[in-house]
């Protein structure tokens, strides 16, 4: 089109357009579940099930608009690359179980759920390949000669030297099972968040089964959500990545066009990042208790 007919809208602040279309590369999803159910045995009932699943995709459409969906897909060369990888939502193993014991008017139920908490990728925090998009998967150098660090400074103060960062980076590779990717780009969504075990407990007591001979019932209940965390503050806590899309470990120094880039390691608080995840000890993941009252008529 004649570009003279298009003007920049300063009210919106946008100067580019993203056009999405269907890909010719097809993904797939597969899952299988097996288990057993205990209907009733001496007041006990329950079930246990295991699910295996696998899914591969070209993109997870990681965004709320066309532009962010396009640029949010981590890649090697360009967001326009169409290649199939494990889905961001592909959690391979999941176990769920429940066991309930009923005796007269009392019921005690235990519920368990165990699974990895998701997938993530290692990537650079900024644009490394010069395509204008900060979505580049991380390359693990074969040796120290393939990566160059620069000091991290604050004013005239050196916070971390280049050698300290190199040592920390090599330790990160060893500690997080990345040695096998030496000389390679890490796969997108190739890593699992830690396994999480969650146990819930419910105790209920029926006080009156037939109030005023009308069949009305009164029941009180006590629910412990994430009961394991009540027993041990480290149990049942979820983990999340140190970065929004996964684990950004390195940041490129200088402009995107630099042919021989230098890097700095990112920090987690006041220290150099040492793990791709951290525990999320918030009210959303710690234990809670609920007292319930139910009147049935």
Residue spans of the language-model regions?
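Gram-negative outer-membrane beta-barrel transporters
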Residues: 1-120
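Outer-membrane beta-barrel translocator domains and adjoining extracellular loop/strand segments
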Residues: 59-65, 121-127, 233-238
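Extracytoplasmic gating/loop element in the C-terminal half of outer-membrane beta-barrel translocons
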Residues: 107-212, 219, 246-278
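Outer-membrane beta-barrel "beta-signal"
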Residues: 284-297
């Amino acid at each position: 089109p004649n570009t003279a007919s298009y003007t920049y809208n300063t009210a919106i602040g946008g100067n580019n357009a993203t056009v999405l279309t269907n890909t010719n590369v097809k993904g797939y999803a597969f899952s299988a579940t097996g288990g057993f159910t205990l209907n009733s045995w001496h007041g006990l009932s329950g079930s246990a099930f295991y699910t295996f699943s696998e899914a591969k995709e070209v993109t997870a459409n990681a965004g709320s608009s066309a532009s962010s969906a396009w640029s949010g897909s981590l890649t090697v060369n360009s967001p326009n690359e169409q290649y199939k990888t494990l889905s961001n939502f592909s959690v391979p193993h999941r176990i769920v179980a429940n066991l309930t014991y009923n005796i007269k008017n009392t019921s005690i139920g235990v519920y368990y759920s165990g699974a990895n908490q998701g997938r993530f990728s290692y990537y650079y925090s900024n644009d490394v390949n010069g395509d204008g998009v900060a979505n580049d998967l991380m390359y693990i150098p074969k040796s120290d000669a393939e990566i160059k660090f620069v000091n991290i400074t604050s004013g005239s103060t050196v916070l971390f030297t280049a050698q300290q960062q190199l040592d920390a980076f090599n330790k990160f590779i060893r500690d997080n099972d990345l040695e096998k990717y030496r000389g390679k780009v890490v796969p997108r969504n190739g890593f699992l968040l830690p396994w999480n075990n969650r146990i819930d407990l419910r105790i209920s007591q029926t006080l009156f089964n037939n109030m005023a001979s009308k069949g009305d019932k009164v029941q009180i209940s006590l629910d412990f959500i994430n009961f394991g965390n009540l027993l041990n503050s480290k149990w049942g806590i979820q983990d999340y990545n140190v970065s929004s899309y996964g684990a950004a470990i390195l940041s490129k120094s200088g402009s995107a066009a630099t042919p021989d880039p230098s890097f700095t390691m990112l920090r987690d608080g006041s220290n150099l990042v040492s793990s791709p995840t951290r525990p999320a000890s918030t009210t959303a993941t710690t234990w809670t208790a609920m007292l319930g009252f139910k009147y049935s008529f």
